[in-house]
Every structure is written in structure tokens, then in C-alpha cells.
């Protein structure tokens, strides 16, 4: 039987050993956080297209290869993902950098790195005869996303710049949910529609043509470069303490994109997730995703984004960007470039 003195001595040295470990972790600072906090919780829309990329990352173990344990949290709405991030329930979501700048102006330390260039287009009905913004005057135009939808604001700015037309005053605006707007233009109840890219892809599969893409609008309005509007968004303080996790996930995202760009077999594997009813829809969705892959992200793209923010601010005002009309420093996380 061990004496109480022996037990106490062992306890003392054990406590001393763990105290040393604790002091080392304190000295490591942010590195200590990275050492233990390997899980990354990403909230996405349940049926969002980002699920395709995350599926590839998980299926091929790309995140695991970076030492990141990826947990995908599927939610019912965009607002739900934002609430999850702001409450700390998840670490990352996918949204646009205009929202990030607005949140930073309100004191939130959110930041962004790119996910996709894909945003949408202005599509016209078959046989509509619409070939210019002038032809849109007096027509019924469906708009997804509401009065301060960024695609709608960019189209308005482009119409004013190219043809001197105030679209906001000259078209009959019909705001609605993306699937409903697609149904209405296909049934002849709308003359044109502005919708998100994956809904546009489904319209292309039905033979509809774009009057203008949002990507073209961005470049024409003076950005001078394609600007990724959508990206992975997270808290700056958390990211700075967990750079290995964020940068590792970013590499796994790029790796998934590269595989999708090169492998038709990978798309065939994903097809059940894409809800494509026929080959034309499947091909349009695939091509739309691939067209949205950013090729570079550096000083040029960041500068272009700031110029685009000025255009959006002029069109949407405080209803879009919040109380500050200035693009907020730190909106783009500086530790990822390519």
C-alpha cells in the first residue's frame, strides 16, 4: 500500500508537468488554438450549389489532407446561415462581400475569401423581340432578391450608362422567389427575368438567351476585371488565430474546383445532387459552375471590387450598404491570394 506522502509527491510532479504544458500553450498563443481546434463548421443552404464543392472536398478527403475536420451544416435559408455565424454556432458561411462590408461597418469582425464569380444574368423570353434595354421599357421584368438585389442594381447602372435609360422607372417590376420567376417566364407571364446563376442555367437549357450577364455588367461598369461576388465568410479574429485551418480549407476548395474543371467523371458522380432533369440542364449547370471559378485573387481584383462597391452604393444607397457608404477595410482576408 502506497503512503500518503508518495501519492502526494506523484500528484505534485504531475501537476507541475501539466503546468509547464499549460505555460507552453500560453506562449504559443494563436498557434495553440490551431493545435487543438481543427474542426471547421460550414453552414450552407440545404440545396445550394456550394454543396457540390463541399461534396467533392469530403468525398476525396481534401480537407482531411490539410488537417481540417470539415462539418457541413445544412440550413433552410440564407438568413439562417447568417444567424448561425453571428451566434457562433458555425465558423463559416457563403455570402457576398457587400454584406461583409456592411457588417463590418456595424462593428462585426467578419471577413471574406472568394468562392465564385457566378452571379446571374438578365434573360429574355423566347420571341420577345427584346434586344436592348430600350426594348425593355414597359415590359414585365422579374427580379429575384428584392429591390436592392445586387444584380438588379448593376443592370440598372448598366442601362443608364449605355443607353441613358432609367430601368427602375420604365419597367414593370415583379419581385419573387427564383423558382416562381422561372416558371412565369417559361409560361409567358414575364418578358424578362433577372435571376441567380443556377436558375439562369435551367432557363438556358430551355432555350432562353441572356440580354446581358452580370459578369459583363461588372466589367463594363468600370471594374476592369471579373470580381468574385460570393465567398466564404468568417470572423477575422477567429481566422487570425486559426490561419492553418482557414488556409488549409481554402486550398481544399481550390483543389476541388481544379478536379471539377478537369473531370467529367466527377460531374457524373455529382449528378444526383444537382437535380438536373435532363442532359441539357445538367450541362448548363456544370458549365455555369465552371464559368464561375475565379482564376486569380489579388490586388487587381480587390481594387476592382472597391470600384464596384461605389457603383452599387450609388444605386442602392444605405438600403444596400447600411449606415456607412464607405467600403470597409478588412472586408477581404489578406492571407489568401492566388
Name each model feature, range by range.
Residues 3-20:
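Bacterial N-terminal signal peptides that target proteins for export
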Residues 18-30:
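Bacterial N-terminal signal peptides
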Residues 31-37:
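Sec/Tat signal peptide C-region and signal peptidase I cleavage site
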Residues 38-175, 184-187, 191-197, 211:
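Short, glycine-/small- and polar/acidic-enriched structural segments
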Residues 65, 215-225, 291-301:
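Short, solvent-exposed loop/beta-turn-alpha elements that line the ligand-binding surface or hinge
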Residues 97-98, 174, 179-272:
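Pocket-lining segment of extracytoplasmic ligand-binding domains
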Residues 239-316:
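Secondary-structure end/capping motifs
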Residues 306-338:
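Conserved C-terminal helix/tail region of periplasmic/extracytoplasmic solute-binding proteins
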Amino acid at each position: 500500500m502506497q503512503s500518503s506522502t508518495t501519492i502526494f509527491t506523484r500528484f505534485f510532479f504531475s501537476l507541475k508537468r501539466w503546468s509547464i504544458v499549460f505555460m507552453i500553450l500560453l506562449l504559443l498563443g494563436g498557434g495553440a488554438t490551431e493545435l487543438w481546434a481543427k474542426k471547421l463548421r460550414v453552414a450552407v443552404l440545404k440545396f445550394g450549389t456550394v454543396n457540390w464543392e463541399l461534396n467533392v472536398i469530403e468525398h476525396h478527403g481534401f480537407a482531411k489532407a490539410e488537417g481540417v475536420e470539415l462539418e457541413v451544416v445544412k440550413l433552410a435559408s440564407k438568413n439562417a446561415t447568417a444567424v448561425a455565424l453571428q451566434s457562433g454556432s458555425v465558423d463559416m458561411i457563403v455570402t457576398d462581400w457587400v454584406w461583409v462590408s456592411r457588417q463590418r461597418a456595424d462593428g462585426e469582425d467578419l471577413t471574406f475569401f472568394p468562392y465564385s464569380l457566378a452571379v446571374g444574368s438578365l434573360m429574355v423570353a423566347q420571341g420577345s423581340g427584346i434586344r436592348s434595354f430600350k426594348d425593355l421599357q414597359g415590359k414585365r421584368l422579374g427580379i429575384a432578391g428584392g429591390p436592392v438585389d445586387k444584380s438588379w442594381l448593376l443592370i440598372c447602372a448598366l442601362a443608364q450608362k449605355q443607353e441613358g435609360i432609367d430601368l427602375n422607372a420604365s419597367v414593370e417590376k415583379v419581385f419573387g422567389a427564383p423558382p416562381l420567376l422561372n416558371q412565369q417566364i417559361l409560361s409567358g407571364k414575364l418578358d424578362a427575368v433577372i435571376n441567380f446563376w443556377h436558375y439562369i442555367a435551367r432557363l438556358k437549357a430551355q432555350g432562353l438567351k441572356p440580354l446581358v450577364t452580370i459578369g459583363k455588367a461588372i466589367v463594363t461598369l468600370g471594374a476592369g476585371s471579373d470580381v468574385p461576388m460570393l465567398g466564404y465568410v468568417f470572423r477575422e479574429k477567429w481566422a487570425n488565430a486559426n490561419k492553418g485551418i482557414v488556409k488549409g480549407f481554402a486550398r481544399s476548395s481550390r483543389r476541388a474546383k481544379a478536379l471539377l474543371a478537369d473531370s467529367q467523371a466527377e460531374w457524373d458522380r455529382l449528378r444526383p445532387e444537382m437535380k438536373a432533369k435532363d442532359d441539357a440542364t445538367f450541362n448548363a449547370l456544370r458549365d455555369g459552375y465552371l464559368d464561375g471559378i475565379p482564376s486569380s485573387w489579388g490586388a487587381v481584383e480587390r481594387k476592382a471590387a472597391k470600384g464596384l462597391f461605389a457603383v452599387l452604393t450609388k444605386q442602392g444607397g444605405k438600403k444596400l450598404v447600411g449606415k456607412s457608404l464607405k467600403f470597409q477595410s478588412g472586408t477581404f482576408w489578406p492571407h489568401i491570394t492566388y
